[in-house]
From Swiss-Prot:
This is Acetyl-coenzyme A carboxylase carboxyl transferase subunit alpha. Its main location: cytoplasm. Its EC number is 2.1.3.15. PANTHER family: ACETYL-COENZYME A CARBOXYLASE CARBOXYL TRANSFERASE SUBUNIT ALPHA, ACETYL-COENZYME A CARBOXYLASE CARBOXYL TRANSFERASE SUBUNIT ALPHA, CHLOROPLASTIC. GO terms for biological process: fatty acid biosynthetic process; malonyl-CoA biosynthetic process. It comes from Caulobacter vibrioides (strain NA1000 / CB15N) (Caulobacter crescentus). It is found in: Cytoplasm.
Length: 320
């Protein structure tokens, strides 16, 4: 897949184009003909990448969180979960591929894993409905959480959605109830649960998989009650002011950790998770492993209390 550059990455894109051009010339001029020049350009591109990503504003982080080449649920499963067996369907209506989940081994430990899947191209994005789950997806999630508790397996979730699907059929089949039931099941689980926001964390559609003991977030991910575009349309009747809304909503990982909404920020490679997906996936794996080890000796009652205390604290802080 060809590299996709965001607006603020244009200077980097220009350098990468020059590197490709010199590499092609090097093939005809002979081995090593432009090695010095190519390396100098690569070093400069890396410097620009570090500078750009060290100073992103909230709107730029939103763009990074939505980057089409950012790793998604199936990438994390492929990189972290061995012997993965996907489980489909909610046993009531259908199988919603916006949420994918199943059983597997995470670094040797049996787990239940699930999350939103957006897809990487037109075909898979349509198949997964761009990560916007219908009621069947959340009911499937509840089914998997029930199974995890029955067999005493930790739950690992990956959150990446603009929000639950707002279509007429979804509403007719009880979208709000399905989201509420999934959120409730998260909060009442008697097994360890770790959620990681790996891209967008949009509204109730995200929190339905994020009511965990520990909520992690990638460095350039976002988590909010509504999209910046939606907030701008409501507040100012102007979706073009999404950048202003993103700043005021405090949706970045750095804001969220100060507010106590998330527990840990997972650093991304220079240039974002999409620039080195393998490194990003393993960094998430290391963080999840740390959190699961910290909860290994906790009883079901302790896990439930820790989880409820965590979310009650968020509510109390909001009232102060």
């Amino acid at each position: 897949m060809a590299a996709h550059y965001l607006d603020f990455e244009r200077p980097i894109a220009d350098l990468e184009s020059k590197i490709e051009e010199l590499s092609r010339l090097s093939e005809t001029a002979g081995p090593g003909a432009f090695d010095t020049e190519i390396q100098a350009l690569r070093d400069r591109a890396q410097e620009l990448r570090k500078e750009a990503y060290a100073n992103l504003d909230a709107w730029q982080k939103t763009m990074v969180a939505r980057h089409p080449q950012r790793p998604h649920l199936r990438d994390y499963v492929a990189g972290l979960i061995d012997e993965f067996v996907e489980l489909r369907g909610d046993r009531k209506f259908a199988d919603d591929q916006a949420i994918v989940g199943g059983l597997g081994r995470f670094r040797g430990q049996p787990v239940v894993v699930m999350g939103h899947e957006k897809g990487h191209d037109t075909t898979t994005r349509l198949k997964h409905n761009f990560g916007m789950a219908r009621p069947e997806g959340y009911r499937k999630a509840v089914r998997l959480m029930d199974m995890a508790e029955r067999f005493n397996l930790p739950v690992i979730t990956f959150v990446d959605t603009a929000g639950a699907y707002p279509g007429l059929g979804a509403e007719e089949r009880g979208q709000a109830e399905a989201i509420a039931r999934s959120t409730e099941r998260c909060l009442t689980l008697g097994v360890p649960m770790v959620a990681t926001i790996v891209g967008e964390g949009g509204s109730g559609g995200a929190i339905a998989l994020a009511g965990a003991n520990r909520v992690l977030i990638l460095e350039h991910s976002i988590y909010s009650v509504i999209s910046p575009e939606g907030a701008a349309s409501i507040l100012w009747r102007d979706g073009a002011r999404a950048k202003d809304a993103a700043t005021q909503m405090r949706i970045t990982a750095q804001d969220l950790i100060k507010l106590g909404i998330v527990d840990r920020i997972v650093e991304e490679p220079a240039g974002g998770a999409h620039s080195d997906t393998e490194a990003a996936i393993q960094a998430v794996g290391d963080a999840v492993e740390d959190e699961l080890k910290a909860m290994a000796a906790m009883s079901p009652a302790e896990l439930k209390k820790q989880r409820s205390d965590r979310f009650y604290a968020i509510g109390r802080a909001g009232l102060q």
